[in-house]
Amino acid sequence: MEFWQHIYSNFNVIAFSIFGLKVHWYGIMYVIALLLALLLAKFFVRKFQLDINEKHLDSYFIWVEIGVILGARLGYILIYDANTMYYITHPWQIFNPYINGEFVGIRGMSYHGAIIGFLIATLLFCKKYKANPWIFLDLVALSVPLAYVFGRIGNFLNQELFGRITNVPWGIYVDGVLRHPSQLYEAFLEGIVVFIIVYLARFKQSFQGELILVYAGAYSLARFICEFYREPDFGIGFVLWGMSMGQILSFIMFITALLVYICIKFKKVNI
């Protein structure tokens, strides 16, 4: 276990360099996650014979990726970043991948901000192409969780979003302090477990949009649990009743998904 506990001391976050451009493992994992999500989406379209053609699907994923990046970055700046006012007054710096002339990529993304960007992109896409948004949302609920696993592995390899201090034998040292590998907990619970739940729900699905609501609820619960092992965000800490910002946002997400589910299930709204 000693090698595992000191893995950060023996691991370089930079995978390789091309013409002086440093390629980080996080970036590689992000690309893998994106491609896997698209491949899984195409697989599920065929498997469940969904009314989505491949051209529309490819176009949709481009729209969604743009929405996710914009939402994730803006969400992080508005919710988590200690320099929010700086970015508001210097908006051109929001997506600046350079720090002091060195390429470091775009750092600081919010999952919950990404969700908002994703939903907006989906609604705009479906309005433009006159498509049913619930079909696309349910497809995303199936195809994203396993891809999400690689995103959290990317966080782990990038040595960020680390866990709270612990004494468990599988903990890893971060700056000389033993901590939970919470990124891997999240990869398992928020990725693999959530996928299993959504996939099984597909075979008992009773209305369009049910899968995305099941995903939202399952992810929120998984994230809420994982936050107990993850170090609270720097500069924010515990926000309310000993809960982190991630837990508060996950609680709001869960309640919202539950209310929408109840309204649709009991025919209080039509879709």
UniProtKB/Swiss-Prot annotation:
An example Gene Ontology biological process: lipoprotein biosynthetic process
Keyword Lipid biosynthesis among record annotations: no
Transmembrane segments: 25-45, 60-80, 103-123, 131-151, 181-201, 209-229, 235-255
Keyword ATP-binding set for record: no
Keywords: Cell inner membrane, Cell membrane, Membrane, Transferase, Transmembrane, Transmembrane helix
Enzyme Commission code(s) on record: 2.5.1.145
CC annotations in GO: plasma membrane
Protein localization: Cell inner membrane
Membrane topology label: Multi-pass membrane protein
Pfam families linked: LGT
Enzyme class: transferase
Residue numbers binding a 1,2-diacyl-sn-glycero-3-phospho-(1'-sn-glycerol): 152
GO molecular function: phosphatidylglycerol-prolipoprotein diacylglyceryl transferase activity
Pathway, per record: Protein modification; lipoprotein biosynthesis (diacylglyceryl transfer)
InterPro entries in alphabetical order: Lgt (IPR001640)
Protein family membership: Belongs to the Lgt family.
NCBIfam families tied to this protein: lgt
PANTHER family: PHOSPHATIDYLGLYCEROL--PROLIPOPROTEIN DIACYLGLYCERYL TRANSFERASE, PROLIPOPROTEIN DIACYLGLYCERYL TRANSFERASE
Function text: Catalyzes the transfer of the diacylglyceryl group from phosphatidylglycerol to the sulfhydryl group of the N-terminal cysteine of a prolipoprotein, the first step in the formation of mature lipoproteins.
Protein name in UniProt: Phosphatidylglycerol--prolipoprotein diacylglyceryl transferase
Organismal lineage: Bacteria, Pseudomonadati, Campylobacterota, Epsilonproteobacteria, Campylobacterales
Name of the encoding gene: lgt
